């Protein structure tokens, strides 16, 4: 069963918190990974790998560059889960 947007957001917020220390309540759909959350490319790749494991999805490297906001990542994960 696919997770809800809120469940994916909460799970992604936990992964971001684990990697960067950013408070989970600071992670919102409209937040930019680079501009708002100041996540660098190395941390982003770690978050992507952990998200692939947590949500059982594959995020191709060429798609990662399209994930500008948390909402972009949540939408991608939702689509990938079917």
Regions found by a protein language model. Give the residues of each.
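Generic C-terminal helix-cap and adjacent flexible tail
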Residues: 6, 78-82
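Core alpha-helical elements of the protein kinase catalytic domain
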Residues: 14, 49-50
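C-terminal structural segments of small proteins and small subunits
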Residues: 65, 71-79
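Thiotemplate assembly-line natural product biosynthesis machinery
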Residues: 2-25
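Residue-level recognition of oxygen-bearing side chains
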Residues: 8, 32, 50, 69-72
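Two-component histidine kinase catalytic core, primarily the HATPase_c
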Residues: 43
């Amino acid at each position: 069963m696919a997770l809800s947007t809120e469940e994916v957001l909460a799970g992604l917020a936990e992964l971001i918190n684990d990697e960067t220390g950013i408070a989970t309540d600071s992670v919102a759909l409209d937040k930019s990974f680079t501009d708002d959350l100041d996540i660098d490319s190395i941390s982003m790749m770690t978050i992507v790998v952990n998200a692939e494991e947590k949500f059982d999805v594959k995020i191709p490297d060429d798609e990662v560059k399209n994930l500008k906001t948390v909402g972009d990542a949540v939408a991608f994960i939702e689509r990938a889960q079917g």
